[in-house]
Amino acid sequence: MDFVPRLNSVLTLVLSGLWHFGLTATNCDNCDDPLASFLSLRAFSSSSDVTGSSSPAHLNWRMGTGGWSPAYSNAQQWLQIDLGNRVEITAVATQGRYGSSDWVTSYRLMFSDTGHNWQEYKQEDNIWTFVGNMNADSVVHHKLLHSVRARFVRFVPLKWNPDGKIGMRMEVYGCSYRSDVADFDGHSSLLYRFNQKTMSTLKDMISLKFKSMQGDGVLLHGEGQRGDYITLELQNGRLALYLNLDGGQARLSSIAPSAILGSLLDDQQWHSVLLERVGKQTNFTVDTNTEHFQIKAETDALDIDYELSFGGIPIPSKPGTFLKKSFHGCIENLYYNGVNIIDLAKRRKHQIYSGNVTFSCSEPQIVPITFVNSRSSYLLLPGTPRIDGLSVSFQFRTWNEDGLLLSTELSESSGTLLLILEGGTLRLLIKKVAGHGTEIITGSGLNDGLWHFVSINARRNRVTLTLDNDAASLPPDISWLQIYSGNSYYFGGCPDNLTDSQCLNPIKAFQGCMRLIFIDNQPKDLISVQQGSLGNFSDLHIDLCSIKDRCLPNYCEHGGHCVQTWTTFYCNCSNTGYTGATCHDSIYEQSCEVYRHRGNNTSGFFFVDSDGSGPLEPLQLYCNITEDKIWMTIQHNITELTQVQGSNAEKPYSMTLNYGGSMDQLVALIDGSEYCEQEVTYHCRRSRLLNTPDGAPFTWWIGRSNEKHHYWGGSVPGIQKCGCGLEQSCLDIGHFCNCDADTDEWANDTGFLSFKDHLPVTQIIITDTNRSNSEAAWRIGPLRCYGDRHFWNAVSFSTEASYLHFPTSHVEFSIDISFFFKTTALSGVFIENLGIKDFLRLELSSPSEVTFAIDVGNGPTELLVQSPSPLNDNQWHYIQAERNLKETSLQVDNFPRIMRETTEKGHFQLQLNSQMFVGGTSSRQKGFLGCIRSLHLNGQNIDLEERGMVTSGVRPGCPGHCSSYGNNCHNGGKCVEKHNSYSCDCTKSPYEGPFCQKEISALFDSTTSITYMFQEPYPVSKNTSTSSSAIYTDTVLSKETILLSFVTAQAPTLLLYLNFSTPSFLALLLSRNGSLQILYHLSKGESHMFTVSTENLANRRVHHVKMNRDGTELSIQMDQQLFSYNFPLEAEFLTVRSLILGKVTETLGLDPRVARANSLGFIGCLSSVQYNHIAPLKAALRHASIAPATVQGSLREFSCGSMVDSDVNAVTTVYSSSDPFGKTDDHDPLTNAVLSDSAVIGGVIAVVTFITFCVIGIMTRFLYQHKQSHCTSQKKEKEYSENLDSSFRHDIDLQSTTSKCKREYFI
């Protein structure tokens, strides 16, 4: 490839580009000359004039009528000026009519090159309304935000002095405008031939303006023989860019465009295009919309052979023919890399070869009309009545699915003809007076905003409906059909004062544009309609198509699909993971911790959206919510132990890990966590890992920033060591990794990487497995993190003058703010951010009111949420405020969301330039006193604590979380304050888990017995209260509480048994019929039996029992039923000595009623057992080594709540001889038999226990001796891939015997 042409093209691009843009800037700086002051009277025209002829309307004009005033003051009036040539307009000014009370208070501007097909001036993508005058003499000047180029300017009054009439004097400011224009008729093109065979460019800049008469056509094309190409092509009114830098790809006809921008580009208005390319980086701009993208290619150069064509792609072998549809319209100021192509063509330079191209823009005089109102817009045009047949044709475009296009009453009682757009489909209906009717249905999706041609032709009994050159007809055998044309044709809708027979509209009026209306093959002059000399109309814009694409740009965020009508747009957020009017709000939480805080207590896979409404997509990961620390786990694509052989420095082994998300997503999750880790394992045999600290490493890993890291698990960044190197416990003291000992036996280095700035591991490289007998295996565990740094990020404001400030909020279209607050103050400002005119403010305006005020330049919008209870109660409350293009909303806690629709007129971009104040205002007044936590702006966390550390009057953190969240600790759990959160202490609860909600339950069989001895409390918690020891004294208990849940199919059976200080006891049992009975045997020998429920509770269902005794009053809750009993006043209740669950093994002296229920033990499931502050079942299962609880028989932990019949049956099938789930014997069990069986079982247990102790003693001595003569090492349980051979797995398992007594510790 020749370097010189490429260098020359780059220099030409840079120098000519600088000259071109410098010249443009110079012209713009001086473009403020008055353009209308010296124009003659003929330059002015108007809709009407009070004098009957045109009046001068120059600024400061005092002669004659002193300016322009129309004959009628209504919304149809306008004042127009012809500037003679296309000029650049930068400003306008107005006055009222001199010496009168006539002036305009607001108006719109329209522009045109031809005096037809007007374009309304827009600002911020809205039709702009200018503020007019307040009197007749003062001048109101407006600098246009962006200049326009036009010959004709039209002022359209909207409002005027209510005590006067419309009156106006005006001036237009700007400068002359020069341009080079080429006109293409759809069958012509310009060819720009290169001086050399191939033009190879590293940079390209192409700029042009175009005005198109149709929606399709090629603007530019060039290609090279090796496959490079560049094409700009109009497709359905949008501009597509095709750009390829690599040869060999598919051709233009079979590939998708690199980018596609714009909409409604066939509106016969000027549109600008700018294409900038530097290597693979490309900026593509159409009007005000820009798309940046990177070309997927190996090279940076664009190689074009021979020529570039503009306006079409001619076929060299067939003159006058083109490869694709050619462009029909005008192109202006066409520059290719600084070369003015049209100027070369006008001067007939040898590089340019032109077809039938002219150098002035010829435009057809097409007059469009706009139907504005869906209720009252219509156009009435006359026809020629009583003609045998009918012919009507026109073009229309709209976004609405439904609307009336045409209604006409036919002559000679031949019925009514209707043309309706319904559901985007065209329906032609002919209704006869006699009740006959027929229809034609054609087309679909006609509400796509494109121009569609419709033609109706009827002759005798034949009717043809043509849509976009596709004809559909009625069946020819309709004998009753005879059509005679009527004298009135209603387009778009019907007037209110007509009868149904004159104009029928079974659907709403049409909103959209029409043009080229023909009736009886004659065109209709719509300018005559505007002047009142033809037909009639209502709510029309004539000589203007004001269609607007509300989905460009697409304000639906996060991939939401934009759907529009004529007046508004909607966002379809299906399958995006987001919700809201513009798909702004994520439906997922920002961390696993927030999920649990919102009440989700089940571990599993969740989608986590770390930046909320920000640009990052949600990522699916696993949340372990049931533990105290909430771990999130992100797995990658390689989970098994992977064997490596045959790698060296010249041919390294490399493996890349894929976590199922982007690096930005992973980094956001890691940075938002308190702690993260990844376990890395390297098994080796004659395969070195890191070498010596001074030597080049043999293995390394790549982290988040694509950097090499030369430390291993258990070590820290900056030192080339493994974990054993830090602990000085490696196999060879001369190395800092076990594998660096380079032995013939298997060794391993395993540990955790926990430096967050380096995580996650994205790649591993191994280079030392190519020597004799050298091999290795590696495993990298999942990324695991816990803790949410954002959710508990809080500050406290101690003075009203204190505040935090942050950089201004650079948001324009959508903004959402969310945070928690708590306070005792009466009022205070949470957040304030100001602009020149715009602002936003969130404040506590009263103890029970929150106000959100925002102004984008159209006047403030204020939302107020009133709480039924005070918000200054020192509890945490949540606020979410949002403003987007569709609505403004405010929500406090779970109160109803307050919403107000956003106006689509005027400003819609929020422009702020001051710092964002949190907790106060710039004036240091109305500051907030209290705490603000978890502040997010558009999903991004605002680090309050970091700024609070260095700000006077503000301190990081906020104590007192238990006051708001203490009720999250259930079942007797106690809320414990932490610095930046809280936790639940479940010591005195029969439950466990983060919120004391996880039941502790177990399966019992007939031999199971748990005996809990009430002595001094066991030390399961350092926070055990001294008051809890009260139940261990010998004093009489005045109160007691018993809780338990059970599942069984056995009756009778004993649920719980309490031994008191004397032979007194308390028993909870099921009688033979399954009813619950409570038996009290008190100190003086009296017994009290309470039958709580006659229902059979031995029904394999979970039942809950809660018993409270306060003195002599006893209340029992059985499931949802509540029972009350009373003891005699002299009843005495002593201290409990022991509590037994399951079978009572000491049966001597047992009450016969208890013995009967105890005979077969308890078979079933018990859960959540509690006596006062003691949880005996929990103590036996969780603290067996220190709790005074003894377990005999089989005890298996199990969830009663998930128990099914098969689980219950599995426990009971062993005892078939006396199956309690079978038919119940009517007779009582034989007490002697029970006692005999118990004695036998007791003897067997004693023998087995003695033998067990003997075996344990012998094994203990043997192991002790073995330990003295052999070194042992701990080995972690391993998982191996099925594809590893058995010898390899066996060798790894033998590592513990070759460790030479070295032990490796990991952080």
Swiss-Prot record:
SMART domains: EGF, EGF_CA, FA58C, LamG. Residues 1-24 form the signal peptide. One of its GO terms (molecular function) is calcium ion binding. Its main location: membrane. It is a single-pass type I membrane protein. Glycans are attached at residues 283, 497, 600, 624, 637. The keyword Transmembrane helix applies. One of its GO terms (biological process) is cell adhesion. Residues 547-584, 959-997 form the EGF-like domain. It comes from the Eukaryota. It holds the Pfam family EGF. One of its GO terms (cellular component) is cell junction. InterPro entries: ConA-like_dom_sf (IPR013320), EGF-like_Ca-bd_dom (IPR001881), EGF-like_dom (IPR000742), FA58C (IPR000421), Fibrinogen-like_C (IPR036056), Fibrinogen_a/b/g_C_dom (IPR002181), Galactose-bd-like_sf (IPR008979), Laminin_G (IPR001791). It is found in: Membrane. Keywords: Cell adhesion, Disulfide bond, EGF-like domain, Glycoprotein, Membrane, Repeat, Signal, Transmembrane, Transmembrane helix. The keyword Repeat applies. Residues 181-361, 368-545, 793-958, 1019-1200 form the Laminin G-like domain. Residues 25-1238 are extracellular. The chain crosses the membrane at residues 1239-1259. Residues 31-175 form the F5/8 type C domain. Gene3D superfamilies: 2.60.120.1000, 2.60.120.200, Galactose-binding domain-like, Laminin. Belongs to the neurexin family. May play a role in the correct development and proper functioning of the peripheral and central nervous system and be involved in cell adhesion and intercellular communication. This is Contactin-associated protein like 5-3. It comes from Rattus norvegicus (Rat).
